[in-house]
Swiss-Prot record:
Family matches, as PANTHER family: CYTOCHROME B
Cofactor note: Binds 2 heme b groups non-covalently.
Main location: mitochondrion
Record's protein name: Cytochrome b
Subcellular localization, as worded in the UniProt entry: Mitochondrion inner membrane
Assembly information from the UniProt record: The cytochrome bc1 complex contains 11 subunits: 3 respiratory subunits (MT-CYB, CYC1 and UQCRFS1), 2 core proteins (UQCRC1 and UQCRC2) and 6 low-molecular weight proteins (UQCRH/QCR6, UQCRB/QCR7, UQCRQ/QCR8, UQCR10/QCR9, UQCR11/QCR10 and a cleavage product of UQCRFS1). This cytochrome bc1 complex then forms a dimer.
UniProt KW keywords: Electron transport, Heme, Iron, Membrane, Metal-binding, Mitochondrion, Mitochondrion inner membrane, Respiratory chain, Transmembrane, Transmembrane helix, Transport, Ubiquinone
Length: 176
């Protein structure tokens, strides 16, 4: 009798990708963080999409919409906590993934390493844009904290921050 994980068409896909993965037997658990990054990213996108369906960014109703998500939406509290903690887990996995690459000397593969550096910059830019979305779903505090380092640049710091903010539109508790 054959094993169901090798005969069933759908389970066979999962088996080939996770269980019978053609990888060396001496591979360590440090090599899981790339896959964990993908899982964290999918969780962030899905929970963010569902949270955005219920959130309002107006200063008068933003807090009420968050309490509505936590109290009235089915498992809304779970969506909120998964989204908040998923962002932290994403960056923890990202830095551990980079640390594993440094430890095992992956920087010697310059083309692959340079693509990873570009992806790191893209992740940082995406995280920033997620905080200062044109929709107005981020706080004045978030925009100022993230861009605060740029304001320390002599002569052009203040103008650079205003340019990144898109002018003087950052002025309320939420960016609407």
């Amino acid at each position: 009798m054959t094993n169901i994980r090798k005969s069933h068409p759908l389970i066979k896909i999962v088996n080939d990708a996770f269980i019978d993965l053609p990888a060396p037997s001496n591979i360590s658990s440090w090599w899981n963080f790339g896959s964990l990054l993908g899982v964290c990213l999918i969780v962030q996108i899905l929970t963010g999409l569902f949270l955005a369906m219920h959130y309002t960014s107006d200063t008068a109703t933003a807090f009420n919409s968050v309490t509505h998500i936590c109290r009235d939406v089915n498992y809304g509290w779970l969506l909120r906590y998964l989204h908040a903690n998923g962002a932290s887990m994403f960056f923890i996995c990202l830095y551990l993934h980079i640390g594993r690459g440094l430890y095992y000397g992956s920087y010697t593969y310059t083309e692959t390493w340079n693509v990873g550096v570009i992806l790191l910059f893209a992740v940082m830019a995406t995280a920033f844009m997620g905080y200062v979305l044109p929709w107005g779903q981020m706080s004045f505090w978030g925009a100022t904290v993230i861009t605060n380092l740029l304001s320390a640049i002599p002569y052009i710091g203040t103008e650079l921050v205003q340019w990144i903010w898109g002018g003087l539109s950052v002025d309320k508790a939420t960016l609407t």
